[in-house]
Every structure is written in C-alpha cells, then in structure tokens.
Amino acid sequence: MNSVQLPTAQSSLRSHIHRPSKPVVGFTHFSSRSRIAVAVLSRDETSMTPPPPKLPLPRLKVSPNSLQYPAGYLGAVPERTNEAENGSIAEAMEYLTNILSTKVYDIAIESPLQLAKKLSKRLGVRMYLKREDLQPVFSFKLRGAYNMMVKLPADQLAKGVICSSAGNHAQGVALSASKLGCTAVIVMPVTTPEIKWQAVENLGATVVLFGDSYDQAQAHAKIRAEEEGLTFIPPFDHPDVIAGQGTVGMEITRQAKGPLHAIFVPVGGGGLIAGIAAYVKRVSPEVKIIGVEPADANAMALSLHHGERVILDQVGGFADGVAVKEVGEETFRISRNLMDGVVLVTRDAICASIKDMFEEKRNILEPAGALALAGAEAYCKYYGLKDVNVVAITSGANMNFDKLRIVTELANVGRQQEAVLATLMPEKPGSFKQFCELVGPMNISEFKYRCSSEKEAVVLYSVGVHTAGELKALQKRMESSQLKTVNLTTSDLVKDHLRYLMGGRSTVGDEVLCRFTFPERPGALMNFLDSFSPRWNITLFHYRGQGETGANVLVGIQVPEQEMEEFKNRAKALGYDYFLVSDDDYFKLLMH
C-alpha cells in the first residue's frame, strides 16, 4: 500500500502588509486558509481599506469508513512540504522556548517512563510506557490548560476562565484555576455522568450542564465567554496549550535510555501529538512520531489523506477522550509537517490493551488512554520489529465504570484469543450432539441456540483460541460435516446487538434496520418514538449503553420503499446520529 501524497502546503504563518522603514506587525499561528491583512500606517498617511476577507471554504465532510487499512500499518503518511523542510527557524524556536520555559511543573508531575516487561517479552521489543495516567487529574490535559492560563495577563485571569468538556480537559482547567486563584466555569453536556461533573465541582469550578452533545456545550461556552468577558480555554487548538502538552515529549527525550525508534501518541484534536512533534522532531528528528486513532474516529488520518482538515460525518464514541469530528487548525498544520503517519486500531484492540495494562501494572486505563499502547503493539507486529525501543503514551485513566463490561467482553477478542462464530445446523435429532463433538476440546465461552420452525437453525457461539490454525481447523471440521460456519468476530453489529437477539429468524417484510446513537438522558426514547410511532411499526429494539457518549441502539422499523424519503426526513429532524444496516450479511444470516 503506497503512502498518500499530499499537495504542497502554502507556507505562511505570518501575514502582514508593511512598507519599508515602517513598523511591522506580525500575527502568528494562523493558517494560510485564514489570512489576515494588516496595514500599519504612520500619522501622516491616510487610512487604507484592506480587501474584504474571503469567505472560508466549506469543510469537506467524510465518513470514517472512507479510509481504512490493516491494523498496525502506518498510513496517512504526509509528504514533507516545503514548509516542513524550510520552515521558519523563529517559529520552531518559539515552540521550543515555550516548552523549555514552561511553568507546568507548578501543577503537573514529570510522569515516569516505565518498561512494560511482559509486553516487551511478548513482542520482542523494549516497550516503554509514558505514564500520564499518573498525573493529579489522571490525564495529561492539565499541562496544556495550565500553560495557557498561567500566561494570561493578571486582569484577564481575574475575570475568570471558561471551557467546554465532558472529561479530562474540564478537570485540567478546574485544577489550574484552583492553583491560580481564579474562577472557572465548565460547560458539560447534560449527558455527562454525575461522577464526572462532581469531580470537576470538587475541584472548585462552577459546572453548567447544557446540551446533549459536546458541540452544543462548546457553543454555549463561547457565547458566555463573549458575554461575560471570560477567557475561553480550548482543549487543543492554541499554541500555549500545544506547548504545554509538548512537555511530554521533552520528558521522554530526557528519560529515554538509548535511541528511540518511535513514540506512539493518541490523537483526538491533535494537541498532544503536535506538541510532542514540535519538540522531538527539532531535537531528535530521527525518532518517528506516530499518531494512533480509533478506526471509527480517524479525523487526523483523513485530514492528512485529503491534505486539509475534514469533518467526520459520524464519530465512534467508545474512546470518548479522542472522539472529535474535526482536528484543530494549528494542530493539523504542525502535524502534517512533523508527524510520520497514523496507525488505526479497533475497539477490540483498545480493550485488549486495557487488559494488558492491568496485567502489567494493575492499573485500568480509559479507552483513549490505552489507544497508543494498542497502536504500538499492532505496529510492532505488522512490521516485525525486534530489539528496538518504542514509547507508548498512556494518556489517561478516567475510566467510566459502565464501560468495564464492554472491555471484559471484548478484551480476549482483541487479543485474538476468542472468536465469535455462527454455524448452520439441521433441525433433526442428534445434530446438536454432532456439533458439540466437532467443537471438541475447544473451550466454549458463549452459546446461543433456539429451535426454529425452519429446516435449519443457527447456533451462535464464542470459543477460546490459542492460534489462528486452531480456529481454521475447527471451521474445516464443521464444513467437512456439511455444517456451514461463518466467522463473525470482526462484526461490531454482531458483538453489540445480534448476539443478544438469538430468538429465531423473522419473516417481517419491509424491515429497515438502523443503528441509532441515543443521548443518555431522560426522554430520549420518547423523543424517538414520537418521531416514528405510530406512523410505522417497530419490529426490533435493542439498547446497549456505552457510557456518557450515548447509547448504541439497534432498531427495526417496517417502512415501505415508497415511504423511505419521509423516514429519512424524520430521522434527520430527530437529530440522533444513525446509519442504515439493513443490507448487513450477518443480520440476514442470523435474523432473517
């Protein structure tokens, strides 16, 4: 698979108009897509009207599924641009100076760089963990928040700060405000679990619950900032926030014992990887800076692929700490010039890495906190790396307790130690016994069977496996006995919903199958029913909570083909994210 060739970036961080021997004003940290014209005039000059600003280009909206590649493969590799090769030395020094002179250690610790002995032995490399989960708020986020806030003028800080967040950034801002003696308002979605907003409140901040989503909370926070004179503290897209996160890279280069092959960094909005790259690539350019994203929340990979920032039309919410639809402007500018590519990992792999960390250090990471570890392991396996030093940043440990159920269910699947299978079995005496004999000594961890009126039934089951050959041998035994067997392990639809709905097949006509994301708040179900019932008959409903990001709901609705346009209009008006899965082969196998 070839690396993606990106168009050359226009190099201009500083846009200004000036005349010889006149003062010059420079504005840093604006991309070439948002140029600002500035006229600096002496007293004897007449006023000059700058050209009208160009309207911003509409952002490209894309699906996460439009860019997928094998686990561990280093994709979305940007071509080095002229800006990267001949970038401003002054700009590079600005970030380096900011990082080196930071005051984040007023509040943050220098987190340890620990060897993961069990993982290192299993992979044949020296795997080091940068333990940002050990920070006072169990996340790296306080570094960037504090670095920006401590630099605010005293009069501005006295007015207070505001931010929007459902998690780690909120705690970072709240703790920083407490340290600096200023007020902080934290706007969080109403779907935020009580344990999270109470943790922020306990740090002394004022919590405002607003909106069903982060976007709504952010919009409200920015309005309040404007109306009340508060300073908005962004979660990632600000030079001082980026520099604060960059101290992680500074520490790694100081703590590393021997040359590093790569540093694996979880990517959401891009603040952490931009900061690390801004430092490490200037002092140790040979070290690879590799981003890791969930396969269903790959905004950075897609932005690098298209050569511009894009917006995801949907974003997976399991790793909620990195579940963003759009990366930052400044973070993208730095990342496309300095990072080496992106590794994509599945939810199963993230769960496996949470288990790896528990077995290694007896600590439980949140999904986003285990993301880099999952990417590092997949990368080492894919490229067959041996005897090199790699670092994975364990970025956070604010685990939502409700998600532990999902983690325990999927961890062995992610380790490729468990497989989910379906076998078609004839409805006749003795067939069940024959099936069990063919499974043989393999451990069955889950088994679902329901007698059907049809000539054959579907058995859904999970088995423990030690090698890929063992699984292939089982499938071969089944097929040789005329029992068709399908491996369903990679299907999220099966693992989230269909495995719990084994009550027999249905012959319902005109059934439209959809996966909706319901906000976790009272009244969400009734809002849904008001949109579709009694207009159409609901034929299937399965709810699966995933924590604060919302509930994953599988819905079947009888909608005649000629009424599909009306159905889509009602679904759009409802405002819940959804997509159609009616044509899924596994749904047809198990349910129809």
Swiss-Prot record:
Pathway it works in: Amino-acid biosynthesis; L-isoleucine biosynthesis; 2-oxobutanoate from L-threonine: step 1/1
EC number annotated for this UniProt entry: 4.3.1.19
A GO cellular-component term linked to this record: chloroplast
Family matches, as PROSITE patterns: ACT_LIKE, DEHYDRATASE_SER_THR
Modification N6-(pyridoxal phosphate)lysine occurs at: K141
Catalytic activity: L-threonine = 2-oxobutanoate + NH4(+)
UniProt activity-regulation remark: Allosterically inhibited by isoleucine. Strain GM11b is isoleucine feedback insensitive and is resistant to the antimetabolite L-O-methylthreonine.
Keyword Transit peptide recorded: yes
Pfam families the UniProt entry points to: PALP (PF00291), Thr_dehydrat_C (PF00585)
Keyword Plastid: yes
GO biological process, one term: isoleucine biosynthetic process
Result of altering R544H: In omr1; loss of Ile feedback sensitivity
InterPro entries membership: ACT-like_dom_sf, Ser/Thr_Dehydratase, Ser/Thr_deHydtase_PyrdxlP-BS, TD_ACT-like, TD_ACT-like_sf, Thr_deHydtase_biosynth, TrpB-like_PALP, TrpB-like_PALP_sf
Main localization, broad class: plastid
Span of domain ACT-like: 419-490, 512-583
A GO MF label: pyridoxal phosphate binding
Keywords (A to Z) from UniProt: Allosteric enzyme, Amino-acid biosynthesis, Branched-chain amino acid biosynthesis, Chloroplast, Isoleucine biosynthesis, Lyase, Plastid, Pyridoxal phosphate, Repeat, Transit peptide
Stated family: Belongs to the serine/threonine dehydratase family.
Biological role stated in the UniProt entry: Catalyzes the formation of alpha-ketobutyrate from threonine in a two-step reaction. The first step is a dehydration of threonine, followed by rehydration and liberation of ammonia.
Protein name per UniProt: Threonine dehydratase biosynthetic, chloroplastic
Taxonomic source organism: Arabidopsis thaliana
